[in-house]
Design a protein with these regions (language model features):
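Partner-binding and oligomerization surfaces adjacent to conserved cores of proteins
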Residues: 1-251
Length: 251
């Protein structure tokens, strides 16, 4: 299956900002067998979620990239806060500092994400999220996710400009796409990330909650890491038998 190229990711991103989805729809139509992958550590809760047909939607405030889905870069807040303190000394009080620091996470606390990858052979992802091949990787059909109302969106990597000091009524909708579907850090580029996205209100949780398990279609396959324990292998065999999917060992 061909990966979603950098150029296509940019085209999809720009179209979504223009309230279109032609490029994304075409990509799905041209790649009906597209598979996306979720890397898991191998903890008991991961196996239980697999067996129950669920994935974890995590709060963006707890992502590895501290600026992921953040509305305001730290330096913008610092300049604004310093200016306010120079004009009014009371803003130096702890209670104001706490409020200022929390505002930068406004969207992060409201946005919930499940990150997926384009391949089950990404060494960086096996290392980061699956315990250096001691965990496992779950394969999902993108088409099944779409039909279940969980549309995956590809992340676009480029320059980000999402400062509160430039936010107004006209720019806000476009900036939301920058916040949700764009990353700037080059170190994340090789992950080929796609995202399932939802808001706290749709999930029935409180902003800032760490996350929630949501229903997804039955996976198509599970890859068990080559360094997985005998206990995990047995657990995956049991779970996969319950949902009738194959397990590939020594991934």
């Amino acid at each position: 299956m061909p990966a979603c190229s950098d150029g296509l990711r940019e085209d999809i991103f720009n179209e979504l900002k223009s309230r279109k989805s032609d490029a994304l729809s075409r990509y799905f139509d041209e790649n009906p067998e597209l598979k996306l992958y979720k890397y898991r550590s191998g903890a008991e809760r991961d196996v239980n979620a697999l067996k129950a047909g669920k994935v974890w939607m995590g709060c963006a405030a707890y992502m590895d990239d501290v600026y992921d889905s953040a509305l305001i870069p730290k330096e913008d807040w610092l300049k604004l806060y310093q200016y306010m303190c120079s004009k009014e000394p009371k803003f130096k009080e702890d209670r104001y500092a706490q409020v200022m620091n929390s505002q930068g996470k406004m969207f992060q606390n409201e946005l919930y994400i499940c990150s997926l990858a384009e391949t089950a052979q990404n060494e960086d992802l096996w290392a980061r999220y699956a315990g250096h091949h001691s965990g496992f990787c779950i394969e999902y059909s993108a088409n099944s996710l779409i039909h279940a109302g969980r549309v995956p969106f590809p992340i676009y990597y480029g320059d980000i400009n999402r400062s509160l000091m430039e936010l107004n009524a006209e720019s806000k909708p476009d900036m939301l796409f920058d916040i949700i579907l764009k990353k700037s850090a080059a170190e994340w580029c090789q992950q080929g990330e796609w995202r399932l996205i939802d808001w706290y209100s749709s999930l029935g949780i409180t902003p800032g909650d760490k996350g929630i398990l949501v229903d997804v279609p039955t996976p198509t396959k599970v890859y068990c890491g080559k360094n997985a324990s005998a206990e995990l292998k047995e657990s995956l065999l049991s779970a996969s038998a319950c949902i009738n999917i194959p397990v590939v060992f020594d991934a």
